Amino acid sequence: MASTVSAANLKVKIIEEVILNGKDQGGTTELTIGSITNVVKRIVNIGTDEIGLLGFGTAYNTELSKTYLAGQFDEDTVRYIRITNLDDTNHIALILKNENNDEFGVKVDKGCSFIYGVDLDGGVVDTMVSADAAGITPDSFGDLVDITCAANTAACDVEVFVAST
């Protein structure tokens, strides 16, 4: 059966609104990402123990040793990732890991979002590295394979939005 889903554009708009001393200091940034054919939008409940949130691998990868609350995705086709902490009290911690077992963490405070900067032509391939400043070069990035998450004090609802080609 042939797909009846037509590719579409994802329009991402970030708006800052602030007036200081009577002058508008805000700004708007827009990005259009073409050829989107798949969108996953989920709200998941994250406890205080670290748990798999998103997984990435090659299309032929059958490694399913880990469970991911929001799903597993083909690393080559992901074009946009947004993770929003919907809680009004607690922060969450995101831990991102690449194929070289490099990890880095990001605190996402109550009501805040984290947008992962994918490669608009190559997905999450060669987009993540963690090392001291002297160890990072333009060619040292590895494939993002894993995003795990934990809440700091009490469970938090987290919205995950992933768009793919």
Give the residues covered by each predicted segment.
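Surface-exposed, low-hydrophobicity beta-strand/loop segments enriched in small/polar/acidic residues
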Residues: 2-165
